[in-house]
A protein has these predicted regions:
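Positively charged n-region of N-terminal signal peptides that target proteins for export
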Residues: 1-5
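Non-globular targeting/processing and membrane-anchoring segments
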Residues: 24-102, 118-119, 216-235
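Thioredoxin-like thiol-disulfide oxidoreductase module
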Residues: 107-119, 144-207, 215, 220-225
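Short active-site neighborhood of thiol/selenol oxidoreductases, capturing the structured segment around
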Residues: 120-137, 165
């Protein structure tokens, strides 16, 4: 009986140790596993990187910065299976489609964003949109934000350094399908409204930027909002 009990205890300790080791695995190792062809290995690594917040996203960006730089310099380059796994991991960690262009990390839980805002002293920039920021066919405005604003080096630097980023789907984006009658179909969104709110750490709206802006204009309103509405850090 004592031998059986000892064996069971040993197995339990080994199982717990394995779980703890994975949870404490260095982020660099998680970044490698995140693009594994084995989903059973990739998905837990992606979830762990996501739980690390912006630091997890930056680890992934730094690990694959050579590949990212090549695809930014050559946008017409045919995607390899490895590149598709890299972008899938980046988008899952960041919760933004084509996030390799911006390197931004978006919270999808407002309460979590508020806690980070209170701890960091940064205001929250909350994007409310139709669809999700990870969707290929999110609302037209959010697609513009991804391709023109968030990918801009000056804009992404301000967003990353001065704000806690949060996105929230208000409702699914309306879609229209055009059937050409010959087997071809075209699916497009039919509305595109979205808005950026500036929130304090209590979630109170203190500013709003509806509609679309060019990168320079958006940078100006962001800087102004960051200076005026910066909350006090809670100790």
């Amino acid at each position: 009986m004592r031998v059986k009990f000892s064996l069971l205890s040993l197995l339990f300790v080994l199982a717990v140790s394995t779980q703890v080791t994975f949870a404490k695995e260095p982020a660099e190792g998680l970044a490698v596993k995140a693009i594994s062809e084995n989903n059973a290995e990739a998905m837990p690594a992606i979830e762990e990187l996501r739980s690390l917040g912006p630091a997890g996203m930056q680890t992934l960006m730094h690990r694959y910065d050579d590949e990212i730089a090549r695809h930014i310099a050559n946008p017409g380059m045919a995607p390899t299976p490895e590149w598709l796994r890299i972008t899938a991991a980046l988008d899952a960690v960041s919760q933004q489609r084509n996030s390799y262009l911006s390197g931004l990390y978006w919270y999808t839980d407002l309460e979590q964003a508020q806690r980070v805002s209170a701890q960091s002293g940064k205001p929250i920039l909350s994007l409310r949109l139709l669809g999700k920021l990870t969707d290929e066919l999110s609302c037209a405005n959010s697609r513009f934000f991804r391709t023109v604003l968030y990918s801009n080096a000056a804009v992404s630097s301000i967003l990353r350094d001065q704000f806690v980023l949060h996105s929230q789907m208000v409702r699914p984006v309306p879609l229209i399908t055009i059937d050409f009658g010959d087997g071809r179909k075209l699916e497009r969104t039919i509305t595109g409204n979205s808005v950026h709110y500036v929130l304090d750490s209590d979630g109170k709206v203190i500013d709003a930027f509806p509609g679309v802006y060019g990168p320079q204009a958006f940078s100006r309103v962001l800087r102004r909002a960051g200076l005026i509405h910066k909350p006090q850090r809670k100790r």
